[in-house]
Amino acid sequence: MKKSIIIFGTAFLIMALSTAKLSAQANYKTGVGIRGGGYENGLTIKHFTNSSTAIEGILGFRPGVIIVTGLYEKHAVAFSERSLNWYYGAGAHIGSIDGGRYYRGYGKDRFYDNDELLIGFDGILGLEWKIPEIPIALSFDLHPRLECARGPYLGIEPAASLRFTF
């Protein structure tokens, strides 16, 4: 757990220092697609409110779990390449886990007899590539989240997203 936090913190610091003087240029206004690889797989929508700020919604699923996440994100050009953007942000999630589910987690194994509410805070740090000349964006990110209602529990979810942009 500590190793993941150190890796996330180091990546965030490198990203912040390398993009401090660069401004992002959104290559699309809205993107809709799929996300997978972490705790939940599901749907994602990202909408830019200006050239460097976006809001993202994620509807995630896994067996017995549904979760909705909202994120506020800042974007900045990565590696002086206009089609690549670093992004980071924060938000929150709410969801539910069905009763009768067994959860294995870092030595804190649990069985949920009843339906349970999930509420917590989220962060995100990633890299997005808007493929030039076609309406597709690919992103890879780390999505740390703090579960408050059933926790406290801190997890870091790596994931990839594929969005159709317009």
Per-region residue spans from a language model:
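Bacterial N-terminal signal peptides that target proteins for export
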Residues: 1-9
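Bacterial N-terminal signal peptides
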Residues: 8-16
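Sec/Tat signal peptide C-region and signal peptidase I cleavage site
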Residues: 18-24
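Outer-membrane beta-barrel domain signature
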Residues: 25, 30-32, 57-59, 110-116, ...
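Residues that define the transmembrane beta-barrel architecture of outer-membrane proteins
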Residues: 28, 37-41, 64-68, 84, ...
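Short glycine-rich beta-strand segments
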Residues: 35-39, 89-99, 143-147, 165
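Gram-negative (and chloroplast) outer-membrane scaffold detector with strong preference
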Residues: 47-140
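Predominantly the C-terminal beta-signal and adjacent terminal strand-loop region
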Residues: 132-166
